[in-house]
C-alpha cells in the first residue's frame, strides 16, 4: 500500500492543476481537465464502474456493493486543483524515508530549510516516510494526498472482497481552492446519502464545522490632477482604500485570531490615485457575528460615500459558503461512524473547526452532508508543504473502515 501511495502521489503532484480565480471557464485551468482525464482511465483500470467526467470537469465513479444488505450509499470526495498562493508548476517531490526528525534542506542554492524551530510539529514525524517540495513550489498535498488515498482505498477494497461494503461513490471536483468546487456538482447524479471530503491535515483530523464565508470587492474611485495644483481637487483612491481599512478592527485579522474567532482579511490591494481595488474575505463561525461583520463593511462604505460622494466607493459583496454544522447535526451518525473508525485503528480523533472551507461546506447545504477527514499534509499552500506517507496510509485505512462499518451497522 505504501508503495502505491508514493507512486500515485508523486506522479499526480507533477501535473500542474492550480485553479485561476480570474478565469471564467469551468474548470478554470486546462491542467485540471488533463488530470481528470487521467483519473478517468485509472479509475477504470482499478475496476470502478460508471466512470464519468462531465463537461465541467467533474469526475465520478462507483464501487458496486458486495453485500445484500440495504446499506446507505456513501461518497468520498477530493479536489483536482491546487492553491493559487504559490507556484504549482514543475513540482519536484522529494522523498525522505525514515525521517530523522531534524531540519531538512529543501534547496541549498536558495537556502530554503524546513526546520523544527519554525514548524514545531516536524519532529513528531520521526521514522516516517515524508514527501516535501524542492523549495521552489508548493507540493499539492492539498488535495492530491486525499485524492491518492481514495484511489488506493478503492483499489484495496476491490482486491479484498472479504471486506463487505455497500455502494460507494467517488468524486473529484475542480476549482475548490477558489471556492467554486460545488458550483456545478450534480448531487442527484452523485446519488449518495452522505459523503466525506478527504481534504484535512494532520493525523486524526475530523471536521464538521466550517466558517460562514463572504467575499467583498471594493472599488475606490479618485480624481487625479497634477500634484502641484491639487489642492481641493485631488481625491486619492489609494488613500481611500487605506482609510477604509483603518476603520476595521486591527485585532480581528487572521494573524491575531484562532479557534472559533472570526476575522476580516485584506487579500489584495492594488491601484493608484485614479482608482484602487481591494478584495476582502469575511469569516465567522457564528451566523449572527457573520451578518454583523458584513453590516460593518456596508456601514463603513456608507459613511465614506456620505463623506466623499456616492461614486467614491463601490461595494460588491457575496456570500461564499456557510457553516456546515447546521446540516451535519441532523445526521450526526456519519460523524460518529468516522470517529469510531479512527478509534478502532488506534487513531485519536482530533475534532476541531475548519478555519477555512471545503467542498463539504457547500455540498452540505446542497443536500449532501459532508464532513472532512485528515489526509496527512502539513503547511499547505507553500514551499514548506509536506505530507507523511505513514499518515496517508492511516487515512486509507479510515476510508476502508468507514465503508465496512456502514455495511456492518445496516
Swiss-Prot record:
Please tell me where Zn(2+) 1 binds in this chain: 79, 142, 199
Any one GO molecular-function label of the UniProt entry = metallopeptidase activity
Please name the catalytic residues of this protein. 81, 176 (proton acceptor)
Task: Provide the primary localization.
Answer: cytoplasm
Q: Which reaction does it catalyse?
A: Release of the N-terminal residue from a tripeptide
Task: Please list the cofactors this protein needs.
Answer: Zn(2+)
Q: What EC numbers are recorded for this enzyme? A: 3.4.11.4
Task: Spell out the InterPro entries in the cross-references.
Answer: ArgE/DapE_CS, Bact_exopeptidase_dim_dom, Peptidase_M20, Peptidase_M20_dimer, Peptidase_M20B
Name any GO cellular component annotation: cytosol
Query: What are the entry keywords?
Result: Aminopeptidase, Cytoplasm, Hydrolase, Metal-binding, Metalloprotease, Protease, Zinc
Membrane-spanning segments: none
Cofactor binding description: Binds 2 Zn(2+) ions per subunit.
Q: Per its UniProt entry, what is the enzyme's top EC class, as one word?
A: hydrolase
Any one Gene Ontology BP term: peptide catabolic process
State where Zn(2+) 2 binds.
Answer: 142, 177, 381
State the HAMAP family in the record. Answer: Aminopeptidase_M20
Q: What does this protein do?
A: Cleaves the N-terminal amino acid of tripeptides.
For this chain, the family text in UniProt reads: Belongs to the peptidase M20B family.
Q: Which named protein is this? A: Peptidase T
Amino acid at each position: 500500500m505504501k508503495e502505491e501511495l508514493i507512486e500515485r502521489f508523486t506522479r499526480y503532484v507533477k501535473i500542474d492543476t492550480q485553479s485561476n480565480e480570474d478565469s471564467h471557464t469551468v474548470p478554470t485551468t486546462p491542467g485540471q481537465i488533463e488530470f481528470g482525464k487521467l483519473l478517468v482511465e485509472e479509475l477504470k483500470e482499478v475496476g470502478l464502474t460508471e466512470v464519468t467526467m462531465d463537461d465541467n470537469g467533474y469526475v465520478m465513479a462507483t464501487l458496486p456493493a458486495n453485500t445484500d444488505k440495504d446499506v446507505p450509499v456513501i461518497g468520498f470526495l477530493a479536489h483536482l486543483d491546487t492553491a493559487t498562493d504559490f507556484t504549482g508548476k514543475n513540482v519536484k517531490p522529494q522523498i525522505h524515508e525514515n525521517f530523522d526528525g531534524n531540519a531538512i534542506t529543501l534547496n541549498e542554492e536558495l537556502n530554503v530549510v524546513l526546520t523544527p524551530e519554525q514548524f514545531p510539529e516536524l519532529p513528531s514525524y520521526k521514522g516516517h516516510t515524508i514527501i516535501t517540495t524542492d523549495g521552489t513550489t508548493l507540493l499539492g498535498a492539498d488535495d492530491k494526498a486525499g485524492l491518492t488515498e481514495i484511489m488506493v482505498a478503492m483499489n484495496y477494497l476491490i482486491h479484498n472482497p472479504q471486506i463487505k461494503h455497500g455502494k460507494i461513490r467517488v468524486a473529484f471536483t475542480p476549482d475548490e481552492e477558489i471556492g467554486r468546487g460545488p458550483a456545478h456538482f450534480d448531487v442527484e447524479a452523485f446519488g449518495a446519502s452522505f459523503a466525506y471530503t478527504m481534504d484535512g491535515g494532520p493525523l486524526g483530523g475530523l471536521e464538521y464545522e466550517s466558517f460562514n464565508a463572504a467575499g467583498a470587492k471594493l472599488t475606490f474611485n479618485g480624481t487625479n490632477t497634477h500634484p502641484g495644483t491639487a489642492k481641493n481637487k485631488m481625491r486619492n483612491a489609494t488613500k481611500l482604500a487605506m482609510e477604509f481599512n483603518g476603520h476595521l478592527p486591527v485585532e480581528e485579522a487572521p494573524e491575531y485570531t484562532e479557534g472559533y474567532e472570526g476575522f476580516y482579511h485584506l487579500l489584495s490591494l492594488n491601484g493608484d490615485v485614479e482608482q484602487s481595488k481591494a478584495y476582502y474575505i469575511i469569516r465567522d463561525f457564528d451566523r449572527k457575528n457573520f451578518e454583523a461583520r458584513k453590516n460593518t463593511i456596508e456601514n463603513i462604505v456608507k459613511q465614506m460615500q456620505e463623506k466623499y460622494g456616492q461614486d467614491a466607493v463601490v461595494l460588491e459583496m457575496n456570500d461564499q459558503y456557510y457553516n456546515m454544522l447546521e446540516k451535519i447535526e441532523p445526521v450526526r451518525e456519519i460523524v460518529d461512524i468516522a470517529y469510531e473508525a479512527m478509534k478502532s485503528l488506534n487513531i485519536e480523533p482530533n475534532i476541531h473547526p475548519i478555519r477555512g472551507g471545503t467542498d463539504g461546506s457547500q455540498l452540505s447545504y446542497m443536500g449532501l452532508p459532508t464532513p472532512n477527514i485528515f489526509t496527512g499534509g502539513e503547511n499547505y499552500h507553500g514551499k514548506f508543504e509536506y505530507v507523511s506517507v505513514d499518515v496517508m496510509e492511516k487515512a486509507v485505512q479510515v476510508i476502508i473502515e468507514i465503508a465496512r462499518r456502514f455495511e456492518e451497522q445496516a
